[in-house]
Amino acid sequence: LRIDKICRTIKERHKYKYNLQAILTDLVYARILSPSSKLASYDYCQTLLEPPKYSLQDVYRSLSVIAEESDFIQSELYKNSNFLYPRNNRILYYDCTNYYFEIEEESDSKRYGKSKENRPNPIVTMGLFMDADGIPLAFDVYPGNQNEQTTLKPLESKILQDFNCSEFIYCSDSGLGSAANRRFNSLGNRAYIITHSLKKMKKEDREIALNP
């Protein structure tokens, strides 16, 4: 995936002395093998064949850089992944979820909203695109009180601009299939498929759906 090249490019734009490639790689390993906090992930990496040569503070410092360069990292990983295996990007799936924080006061993007776990805590919303094989393509994080339907256009616009991906069928559940989102995915060489409840369909439409 040429993560080394990605990290070299990032370092040219930032002033830091730690090894971003080593930190990013170890965080991915830890997330797959033993998902936990950054502190626990750092401790876990100490048990690997090649333990970290960076400090825990370096991990914390790198997080702001990774967050700032998130869009660049995602687009480069997508482009580089095509060298390993051609991505099936003719169909893209989009969905949202949210994450809660065990805090009481709102701050930044952590806002009170409708938690999917029915938690009374501030949350953030994450929107994620996957390709037809279920491999993640791009994601972004939004304020927890933002309507999920409005998260689509900004992220899809990034895909159109940065991923060189403009001919696909957009698929989502009915909750993300607003008129504005359907209209947006009728432009260019895009189309859409939105799930729809049979119970809410008109009788004639339901008969066609059940007997195509």
Predicted regions, residues:
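An internal, acidic/charged active-site-proximal segment
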Residues: 148-212
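Short glycine/serine/threonine-biased micro-segments
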Residues: 111, 125, 132, 142, ...
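Generic structural signal for residues positioned in beta-strands
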Residues: 125-127, 191
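Short, flexible loop/turn motifs enriched in small residues
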Residues: 118-124
